[in-house]
Protein backbone atom coordinates (compact mmCIF):
# COMPACT_ATOMS: atom_id res chain seq x y z
CA UNK A 1 0.00 0.00 0.00
CA UNK A 2 1.44 3.34 -1.07
CA UNK A 3 1.33 6.40 1.16
CA UNK A 4 -0.32 9.51 -0.30
CA UNK A 5 0.23 13.10 0.79
CA UNK A 6 -2.67 15.54 1.17
CA UNK A 7 -2.94 18.98 -0.39
CA UNK A 8 -5.76 21.34 0.54
CA UNK A 9 -6.88 24.32 -1.49
CA UNK A 10 -6.46 27.46 0.69
CA UNK A 11 -10.19 28.26 0.77
CA UNK A 12 -10.96 24.89 2.36
CA UNK A 13 -9.12 25.66 5.56
CA UNK A 14 -10.89 29.01 5.83
CA UNK A 15 -14.27 27.33 5.28
CA UNK A 16 -13.54 24.67 7.88
CA UNK A 17 -12.58 27.33 10.42
CA UNK A 18 -16.16 28.60 10.32
CA UNK A 19 -17.62 25.19 11.22
CA UNK A 20 -18.24 23.67 14.62
CA UNK A 21 -14.80 22.38 15.68
CA UNK A 22 -15.91 18.76 16.05
CA UNK A 23 -17.34 18.67 12.49
CA UNK A 24 -14.28 20.40 11.05
CA UNK A 25 -12.05 17.84 12.76
CA UNK A 26 -14.19 14.97 11.52
CA UNK A 27 -13.94 16.21 7.93
CA UNK A 28 -10.16 16.67 8.21
CA UNK A 29 -9.83 13.20 9.71
CA UNK A 30 -11.84 11.76 6.81
CA UNK A 31 -9.52 13.37 4.25
CA UNK A 32 -6.59 11.67 6.02
CA UNK A 33 -8.51 8.40 5.95
CA UNK A 34 -9.12 8.76 2.20
CA UNK A 35 -5.39 9.32 1.61
CA UNK A 36 -4.43 6.29 3.70
CA UNK A 37 -7.02 4.03 2.04
CA UNK A 38 -6.63 5.22 -1.54
CA UNK A 39 -6.11 1.72 -2.96
CA UNK A 40 -9.12 0.30 -1.11
CA UNK A 41 -11.69 2.84 -2.34
CA UNK A 42 -13.56 3.01 -5.62
CA UNK A 43 -12.95 6.45 -7.10
CA UNK A 44 -15.72 7.16 -9.57
CA UNK A 45 -15.72 10.42 -11.52
CA UNK A 46 -18.52 12.73 -10.45
CA UNK A 47 -19.39 13.62 -14.06
CA UNK A 48 -18.22 12.61 -17.55
CA UNK A 49 -16.79 16.08 -18.17
CA UNK A 50 -14.95 16.13 -14.82
CA UNK A 51 -12.68 13.12 -15.20
CA UNK A 52 -10.33 12.72 -12.30
CA UNK A 53 -12.54 14.57 -9.82
CA UNK A 54 -14.08 12.24 -7.24
CA UNK A 55 -16.31 12.70 -4.22
CA UNK A 56 -16.73 11.10 -0.84
CA UNK A 57 -19.73 11.63 1.45
CA UNK A 58 -19.42 12.34 5.17
CA UNK A 59 -22.89 12.78 6.64
CA UNK A 60 -24.34 15.83 4.84
CA UNK A 61 -20.94 16.92 3.53
CA UNK A 62 -19.16 16.06 0.27
CA UNK A 63 -15.40 15.96 -0.12
CA UNK A 64 -14.28 16.59 -3.71
CA UNK A 65 -10.77 15.42 -4.52
CA UNK A 66 -8.43 14.24 -7.26
CA UNK A 67 -5.61 11.73 -7.14
CA UNK A 68 -2.15 12.21 -8.62
CA UNK A 69 -0.78 8.66 -8.53
CA UNK A 70 2.59 9.64 -10.05
CA UNK A 71 3.32 12.06 -7.20
CA UNK A 72 1.35 10.15 -4.53
CA UNK A 73 -0.86 13.15 -3.84
CA UNK A 74 -4.53 13.52 -2.94
CA UNK A 75 -5.63 17.05 -3.80
CA UNK A 76 -8.69 18.16 -1.81
CA UNK A 77 -10.54 20.63 -4.04
CA UNK A 78 -13.52 21.43 -1.83
CA UNK A 79 -15.62 20.31 1.10
CA UNK A 80 -19.23 21.33 0.59
CA UNK A 81 -22.50 20.87 2.46
CA UNK A 82 -24.97 19.02 0.24
CA UNK A 83 -27.44 21.98 0.34
CA UNK A 84 -24.86 24.12 -1.45
CA UNK A 85 -24.76 21.67 -4.37
CA UNK A 86 -28.32 22.34 -5.51
Predicted regions and their residues:
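A short, surface-exposed loop/turn module that caps and links secondary-structure elements
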Residues: 32-57
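Compact soluble domain cores
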Residues: 23-35
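Enriched for short, Lys/Arg-rich terminal
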Residues: 1-26, 58-62, 66-86
Amino acid sequence: MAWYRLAYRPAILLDLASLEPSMAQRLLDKTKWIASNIDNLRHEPIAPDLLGLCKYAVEDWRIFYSIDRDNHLVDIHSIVHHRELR
